[in-house]
Amino acid sequence: MAENQYYGTGRRKSSAARVFIKPGSGKIVINQRSLEQYFGRETARMVVRQPLELVDMVEKLDLYITVKGGGISGQAGAIRHGITRALMEYDETLRSELRKAGFVTRDARQVERKKVGLRKARRRPQFSKR
């Protein structure tokens, strides 16, 4: 492992991302694929780039990411959280800027479990008066 490599773990919903950052040209590799190949949706790509754009490091750092679990939106959120943590390890002065944007806080919202006697978590079966 390189000495000038920084690491951050990000989580969102049921996804977990491991993010490695090192100085480079702005290459983003997710599970051995490019950002454009991995995420078909432009919104997911935007979410991933947000912390880098905020601190103007898009072309200064290379990112190597492995992500598991969940769907597209959860994985994008987990990667964003991981990048934020790795950036804070890289330069602690970025913390306040990232905190202000709301990237440092882990989004703790999870899927609510289905209850017995209900159709979904809160959706009740149709009620018939007669």
From Swiss-Prot:
One of its GO terms (biological process) is translation. It comes from the Bacteria. InterPro entries: Ribosomal_Su5_D2-typ_SF (IPR020568), Ribosomal_uS9 (IPR000754), Ribosomal_uS9_bac/plastid (IPR023035), Ribosomal_uS9_CS (IPR020574), Ribsml_uS5_D2-typ_fold_subgr (IPR014721). The keyword Cytoplasm does not apply. GO terms for cellular component: cytosolic small ribosomal subunit. Keywords: Ribonucleoprotein, Ribosomal protein. GO terms for molecular function: RNA binding; structural constituent of ribosome. Pfam families: Ribosomal_S9. HAMAP family: Ribosomal_uS9_B (MF_00532_B). Belongs to the universal ribosomal protein uS9 family. This is Small ribosomal subunit protein uS9. It comes from Edwardsiella ictaluri (strain 93-146).
